[in-house]
Amino acid sequence: MPTSTSPPVDSSLVHGEVVFDETGRSFSGATVYVRLEDVSRADAPARIVAEQILQDIAHTAGTATQLQFALEGAVPDERARYAVRVHVDVDGDGQVSRGDFLSMESYPVLTYGNPNNVTVRVQELR
């Protein structure tokens, strides 16, 4: 029986951009956490493989704000599933809370034919 895996991947380099929802409110001084996560285990928390932290980020409501990112971790397991997740910590408390911006969709990368370049849209948590 054939297995459902992708060809081997040489590196877990993932790059792309974070795009803010234009309807979200203005802010400044935020910290953005961009994480590459192993999301293979259905009933367990995702494991962080790589993280980039962007500090002192600002966004003006009604404008298109884009941030570039690059994440690199160990060579990925071709049988695992990976995704990029973004949390924009507006209030600086280190927790996901109302007023922060989050990626609300899954952004799979690296294995199973998924890309290594993604555009991650974030929306304000209301």
Question: What do the predicted segments below correspond to?
Answer:
Residues 50-74:
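A beta-strand/beta-hairpin structural motif
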Residues 43-52, 98-104:
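Short beta-strand and strand-turn-strand segments in soluble, beta-rich domains
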Residues 23-29, 43, 76-78:
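A short beta-turn/strand-edge loop motif at beta-sheet boundaries
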Residues 12-21:
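A short, amphipathic beta-strand motif
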Residues 76, 87-102:
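Short acidic/polar inter-strand loop motif in beta-rich domains
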Residues 2-7, 107-126:
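Extracellular beta-sheet/turn segments enriched in Thr/Pro/Gly and aliphatic residues
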Residues 31-37, 83-87:
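Beta-strand signatures of extracellular beta-sandwich domains
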Residues 20-22, 38, 90:
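Short solvent-exposed capping/turn motifs at the termini of beta-strands
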